[in-house]
Every structure is written in C-alpha cells, then in structure tokens.
C-alpha cells in the first residue's frame, strides 16, 4: 500500500496551512519534520488507517502493526522562530497526537520550538502527545478520551539521550475529559510526565513556569477551544463533507460509528471501507465554462461585477481599496468565509456554523447598512434592501456556558451598489476632469478605469 503522509510541511519556512481536511492515510496524516517558522491551524486530521499494512513497519518488524498516526511535527529549528499548531481537530487516530520532532541543530544540541494550543483531540489510542523538543508551550488543549483510548497521559516529553543541552516544556490550561464525562486538569504524573531513555541524565528543570514565547493568535480556554474548533475546522467551504460532519458530531457527543476490521477498536478504521469508503462521500463534480473567469486572473467574473472591476482586464495584483491586500487576496478571503450570493431574502440554519454549541443563544453582533437580520429558533433571516452594498459582511454571535464565538457571513448582492459608477463614454469629456491611474489628466478616454473627484469611474 501507499505509505506516504497525507499532507505535510517538511522543511517548510514562513508557511501556513489552514482549514484542510486529512483522513484515511497510511503512515501519518501530516508531517513537518525539519520545519522552521510555520503554522498549522483549523485543520482536521482524522481516521488515520490503523492496521493497514504499513510497508516500512512490516519490513522492520516482520509483521503488520497499528500505525494510524495523526502527525509528527517539527518547527522552530535551525535558528528560526517557532512552529505553531493551534485550533486543529485530531480525531480517531491511534497515535502521534502529536509527535514532537525537535531534532538536533548543527552542533548536536536539542532543537525545536513548538507552540501547541487550543487543539481538540478525541479518541486517541495508545499515544497522545509525545516525542521531544528543546522548548515547548503545551497549553489550553482539550483532550477527550474515547472508547479506543488506553493512554492517559496527554503529554509524555521524552528525553532520549541523543543530544546535548536541554528539553523543557510549559504546561498549563489543558483538560482531559474522562470517559465518564468528568474533567481532569493539568497534574504532573497524572496528565503529563517526562521519560528518560538511552542513559539520559536529567540535570535541568524539565518544566517551565511560564510560556517560552508569545502565541501570535488569540489563546482561548480549553473549554472555549472545544466549542469553537468544532464550529470551524477542516475544509468546510463552500460546504462541509459528510465525513467531516460525522467526525465533528462524534467528537462532540463522545461516540463512534466505525470498528477496525482487524483490531476491533472502536472509531479506529483499518481501511477506508470500515468507514464507508469513498463511495459514501457526498462529493459532487462540477465544471466551469470559459465565461467563469474571462480574463483568467483567478477572480471570477461574478465577483468582478460585484466589486466593479473589469472582468476583461486582469487585476489580480491590483489593490483597489488601498489596504495592501491584492484584489485576488480579497476574493480568496471572501470565499474562505461563509458566503451567500443572493437577490432576495434568505435564511441560514446557524447550527451548521456553530456545531460545537449544543444549546446556543444567538444574536446579531454586526449588521451593515442596507441589510436587515433577525434570528428565531436558531434560524437567521437576512433581507437585503435596495440600499445594500454589493458586498457586505454580517456578524453573528453564539453564546453558551460562558463561552462565545463570533462568525462572519459574507453577502453578495448583485442589485446593490459597488461604489464604482458607470458613465457613457461619450459624456466623459464634458464633466469634471478625468484622470488615469497614473494621475494624468485624460480628455479623450478609452474604455477603462479612471478617477474623478477621488472616486473610481469605469468607462465602457
């Protein structure tokens, strides 16, 4: 079988992986050995195939072994900054939830700088987080035991005697939810420990009282992370796959729906058919015609019509609103957020976007001009009016048990105003002075984009 990783950032530097879904892999779902400054966030790694015939392990041990591993993670190596792993969901994986791969620097000293926070881990088997790194922040994570879980330690920092220097960790704010639903907070010897091997002598302090480095993302409590990660994780735009929705619901409710055919372990499939196989996935194939993006700049025509840019002229590297993000980046950010293209009133079932909240109370946290919004029994009704902009953002807040989450909902309204005005070409030379984008006065303009009195004007 194919024993490659599902996805990875091995050796990467200054890189981010965001909102990905990885499942049914052999070896492990994700690997970033040797990575430097990088981030993995809002990604779901689930159902790594367990007793699946991992070729290398068979060659080394002469037998098939359980190898349903989530991730081996590097970061902050070779003088770089830090590897950041936050707001991810790891579910139904036997081991490596996570496996720390700090490595050694060029002089043989322990390397690696890891910041692991606000992750949710459910139904691991015999291994949660283990391995070694020079400096580790392990904080505000939520580990929920499942029917396959046999390892109680959330963190085993392993000092293996292969290098020089120290390996230490800051541990704080983590929760282990027991199989009976009770919660256990950080306690050395109960939820975390260190291990010595290969003659390693511990002549340093293995635990730090404070984080080694700043976390460059908002750090929530473990309780908040549990609800908020389950509400927004994985490849969930434009729609969430039924597989991912199932895994989220099982994590929320503490259930499983699969059994490994060889191991008999609940929730840990040995092959994809244990989980229904590829035929069970609700994947719909679609194709686009050539008119979807006429100028081939990566921005579809429908979005260019909404923003008032010219779909016949590539503008992917332009910055129409002067915010230092290109027009292409603006489009990608818009479609990466829940979005709706409408011409009339519509409704949204908020349960689909706040899956981590069982009994949430909802409120409108921000409503743009020209849009009316109301919520009843978890159903959001949105009504655009003629004064609405072509692009606007509505904000909805969910609250439950002292925890809250605010999510954006982008609304495209073709009947609204883009703020860019079309004027007939024949009338252009009779009005106020017109300037091109190099701020040169134009008296006989050709079709294109111009400036008049500080506003953009399109002449067609």
Language-model-detected regions and their locations in the chain:
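C-terminal edge beta-strand
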Residues: 402-416
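Surface-exposed or secretory-pathway low-complexity segments enriched in glycine-proline
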Residues: 344-348, 352-379, 407-410
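Extracellular calcium-associated, cysteine-rich motifs in secreted modular proteins
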Residues: 275-342
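Right-handed parallel beta-helix
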Residues: 1, 11-24, 36-100, 110-125, ...
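Extracellular beta-rich repeat passengers
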Residues: 99-104, 109-275
């Amino acid at each position: 079988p194919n024993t490659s990783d599902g996805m990875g950032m091995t050796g990467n530097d200054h890189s981010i992986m965001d909102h990905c879904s990885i499942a049914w892999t052999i070896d492990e779902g994700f690997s970033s050995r040797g990575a430097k400054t990088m981030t993995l966030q809002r990604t779901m790694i689930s159902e790594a195939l367990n007793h699946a015939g991992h070729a290398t392990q068979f060659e080394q041990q002469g037998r098939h072994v359980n190898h349903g591993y989530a991730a081996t993670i590097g970061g902050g190596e070779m003088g770089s900054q830090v590897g950041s792993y936050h707001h991810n969901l790891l579910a139904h994986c036997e081991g490596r939830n996570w496996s720390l791969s700090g490595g050694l620097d060029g002089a043989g000293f322990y390397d690696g700088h890891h910041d692991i926070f606000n992750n949710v881990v459910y139904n691991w088997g015999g291994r949660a987080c283990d391995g070694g790194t020079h400096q580790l922040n392990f904080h505000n994570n939520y580990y929920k035991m499942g029917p396959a879980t046999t390892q109680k330690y959330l963190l085993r920092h392993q000092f293996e005697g292969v290098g020089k220097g120290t390996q230490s960790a800051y541990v704080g704010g983590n929760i282990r939810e027991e199989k009976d639903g009770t919660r256990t907070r950080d306690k050395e010897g109960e939820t975390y420990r260190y291990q010595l091997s290969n003659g390693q002598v511990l002549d340093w302090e293995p635990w730090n009282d404070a984080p080694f480095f700043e976390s460059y993302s908002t750090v929530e409590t473990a309780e908040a992370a549990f609800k908020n990660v389950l509400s927004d994780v994985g490849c969930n735009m434009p729609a969430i796959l039924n597989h991912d929705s199932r895994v989220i619901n099982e994590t929320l409710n503490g259930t499983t729906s699969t059994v490994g055919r060889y191991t008999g372990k609940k929730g840990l499939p040995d092959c994809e058919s244990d989980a229904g196989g590829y035929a069970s996935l609700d994947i719909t194939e679609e194709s686009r015609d050539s008119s979807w993006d006429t100028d081939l700049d990566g921005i579809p025509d429908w979005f260019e019509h909404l923003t008032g840019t010219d779909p016949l002229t590539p503008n992917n590297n332009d910055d129409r609103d002067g915010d230092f993000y290109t027009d292409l980046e603006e489009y990608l950010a818009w479609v990466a957020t829940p979005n709706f293209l409408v011409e009339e009133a519509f409704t949204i079932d908020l349960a689909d976007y706040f899956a981590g909240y069982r009994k949430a109370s909802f409120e409108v946290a921000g409503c743009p001009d020209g849009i009316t919004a109301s919520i009843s029994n978890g159903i959001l009704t949105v009504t655009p009016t003629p004064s609405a902009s072509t692009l606007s953002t509505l904000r909805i807040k969910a609250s439950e048990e002292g925890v809250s989450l605010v999510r954006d909902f982008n609304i495209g309204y073709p009947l609204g105003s883009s703020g860019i005005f079309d004027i007939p070409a024949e009338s252009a030379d009779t009005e106020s002075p017109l300037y091109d984008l190099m701020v040169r006065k134009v008296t006989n303009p050709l079709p294109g984009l111009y400036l008049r009195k500080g506003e953009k004007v399109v002449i067609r």
